[in-house]
Amino acid sequence: AYAAKPATPEEVAQLLKAASENGVPVTARGSGCGLSGAARPVEGGLLISFDRMNKVLEVDTANQVAVVQPGVALTDLDAATADTGLRYTVYPGELSSSVGGNVGTNAGGMRAVKYGVARHNVLGLQAVLPTGEIIRTGGRMAKVSTGYDLTQLIIGSEGTLALVTEVIVKLHPRLDHNASVLAPFADFDQVMAAVPKILASGLAPDILEYIDNTSMAALISTQNLELGIPDQIRDSCEAYLLVALENRIADRLFEDIQTVGEMLMELGAVDAYVLEGGSARKLIEAREKAFWAAKALGADDIIDTVVPRASMPKFLSTARGLAAAADGAAVGCGHAGDGNVHMAIACKDPEKKKKLMTDIFALAMELGGAISGEHGVGRAKTGYFLELEDPVKISLMRRIKQSFDPAGILNPGVVFGDT
């Protein structure tokens, strides 16, 4: 593939217009952190890298938005807003990821339980169509009810409809005080039964994660975590619930943390450990690296299915049973607050693994869920998507793709598997 690094929207427009006229496939690339292969270029095609379009153009505190280019890394956006008392709250597992990549996959992360995913935090876009036309969608306003919402249509489209060249993101107040509670449970069903109680309590956790015992052991061993949990408790528990809270007032945070700890004990936790400062940060950072910890211990693949929260116990127990029947294993952690399961799959037989993955994805959909909650379909999941998704919906998506990209140059092979 050939590569281009445009510096302006106009240069992107020139590249796309020429590519359309000559039938050259185009793949956009941000920081390359995606887990579904959507940024992998087509042989003989053009890779458009947004490395040079990496500026925070404006931080507008009056409207609580930032205007950024797609190549801006989340760490750089956070630094640019640090002195304003505001922040962008979409925090996927890799903070070096770009805002453009977040938009492309509708990224989420651990804080989605409180702040939502990318589509809840992106108010407007500038995008270039495959014809070379430049459009603006949305804006700095909090709401709009004028025609179709093109901003939301482009978010999550994985570079198949248009290339984003500017993003208006919503900013939220920074809350200076935070702490976490880690609670081991002897039974996984108790973990999931605690989740709706915490969400209904009014405490508004910004992180609400489950971690199964196998994954916690992997995190502790690979990330050198010292959590102060006795071996006897670690050996006897099936899963953990991590609850993080934030507040602008330290005393209120202390009261809320006490309340959470008491609730967890009443809901069946073996114990509740308050993690402050460095310990909490280390565990959260380790949780963000859970995929790599699983890979280091032999996992062959990872899935990020999403199901209704109430269906998580059935999904996880059934998935583990399917894996065992295939002479494999399915372990993991995930966003308990929004039903997003991050499961590492270990299965050495390629045919068995493919069937296992299909069965697990089918299970998620039978329970009212979806194949991917935040990683996207990309190239890696196209076969499963086309096999399991409603064909009427797929047909409609193809027609939308055709309307935006009649020449079919944008990211062929992604979502639909066409090359």
Q: What function would you assign to each model-found segment?
A:
Residues A1-M53, V68-P70, Y88, A336, ...:
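Glycine-rich N-terminal segment of FAD-binding domains in flavoprotein oxidoreductases
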Residues A19, G159, M343, D405:
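Conserved, mostly hydrophobic/aromatic
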Residues G30-C33, G93, Y210-N213, G376-V377:
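Short, ordered loop/turn segments at secondary-structure junctions
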Residues K55-A62, A66-E209:
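FAD-binding subdomain of flavoenzyme oxidoreductases
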Residues E133, T382-T419:
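Activity-critical C-terminal alpha-helical subdomain
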Residues P173, P184, M192-D359, L363, ...:
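C-terminal substrate-recognition/cap domain of FAD-linked oxidoreductases
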Residues A370-V377, P412-G413:
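Short acidic/histidine-rich active-site segments
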